[in-house]
Amino acid sequence: MASALAGPRFPPLPKTLLIISLKMYFTPSRTIDYIQGLLEPRNDIIRQENRSRLLLALIPDFLTIYPCSEAIKEFESNLAAPQDADTPPPLLLGAQDCFWDSLGPYTGEISPVCLRDMNVSIVELGHAERRAIFGETDQQVARKAAAAADQGLIPLVCIGEVSTLGPIVSEAIGRAVGECEAQIRPVLEALPRDAPVIFAYEPVWAIGKPQPARVDHVGAVVSGIRSVIERIDRHRKGEVRILYGGSAGPGLWGPGGLGKEVDGMFLGRFAHDIEGVRKVVREVEESLR
């Protein structure tokens, strides 16, 4: 009876997370080549000795989730050491969205049940592009997050201010934290307290730009976000991680960078080649020593 009532089992989260979203940039063949490049031992992306402290995750398009899942399973089957249940897998698989119901008459939508069955572990939700183009609301994102968590999937919820930086730094930070709180609160209220959640802080004005937001701005806003989370739900048992996205890439993590401010990075186009990923991984590994 106890096992029947047990909640969903979530994958363990190491200290630092690097999550790559391919959006709709790659064809299926390029995605398959890309994940094989990530898993290729000669490319030195995934190091066995760092898996308990650094997690790499890939979020491809929906069409290639299954072949990516098969590639990861094949890679795991070739590992010399057996996989412990408490050790994070070498590469987590994610999806770019899901629906807020498990199954039903929802043409074109993506079921969290189906994602779970294809070994998906993380679901990206509420990206600024979906909020702007498709009109997704904070409440819809929260419902999706709850549906994902119900299936043992970790919600990766994108948050970030729309308002641009002003001349007064304290006011800009206050506005940013306030806008993020409006996006965070419904999610925390919808999720079970033992469910993990990842928030990807992406200032909308930094997405797709040549340069990311300034480190001091990110640090101040993320500090405010942590205070907001503590105030909203101080009794939460599930892990809460905060990543930075928004033109994140190589050179952003090392000395003087984001390593002490956030729990990882949400990577986009700057990780579209294997060399870029390797550079970021090496930067993070240096900080873990």
From Swiss-Prot:
Pathway involvement of the protein, from the record: Carbohydrate biosynthesis; gluconeogenesis; Carbohydrate degradation; glycolysis; D-glyceraldehyde 3-phosphate from glycerone phosphate: step 1/1
Catalytic activity: D-glyceraldehyde 3-phosphate = dihydroxyacetone phosphate
Subunit and interaction comment: Homodimer.
EC number: 5.3.1.1
Classification via SUPFAM superfamilies: Triosephosphate isomerase (TIM)
Keyword Cytoplasm: yes
Protein name as catalogued: Putative triosephosphate isomerase
Cellular component per GO, a single term: cytosol
PANTHER family according to UniProt: TRIOSEPHOSPHATE ISOMERASE (PTHR21139:SF2)
Subcellular location: Cytoplasm
Family: Belongs to the triosephosphate isomerase family.
Positions annotated to bind substrate: 23
Molecular function in Gene Ontology: triose-phosphate isomerase activity
GO BP terms in the entry: gluconeogenesis; glyceraldehyde-3-phosphate biosynthetic process; glycerol catabolic process; glycolytic process
Record key words, sorted: Cytoplasm, Gluconeogenesis, Glycolysis, Isomerase
One Pfam family this sequence matches: TIM
